């Protein structure tokens, strides 16, 4: 137990270092499926293991799944639940989420955002040196600018923010599969 606690402390310190450098962050997180020892990537998930029901008949919803790191974390912790994944960014959906279905069972991936009505909306993605910093993707452009000012203040002038149209589905209109 002590060795596991020491490992987790070191792991979460390493994750903070990774998250402080955009190039390293993208390199590691884009390839996290090869670094499963980093999962779950947040210690809060260990608490969720104590309070969430690990049941094949229960459901987990991963909204704004991005790379699917939370979903991978749940699977690496042993959760067998159905997981419904929602990610509006098509590039991430295609490159990172679709392959997860081959690795993990009972995943249901969807390439749209959830909302209170069916429509399309602008989705903003910052790019650094031509690479998307997808974890800052947002419907709110100023949120991205403020997040970068806080997280990577010296890089703000090197960031290009691109706009994409994405589909939003009304949450209560989704039909169960």
What are these regions (language model features)?
Residues 2-177:
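Phosphate/nucleotide-binding beta-alpha loop and adjacent structural elements of enzyme active sites
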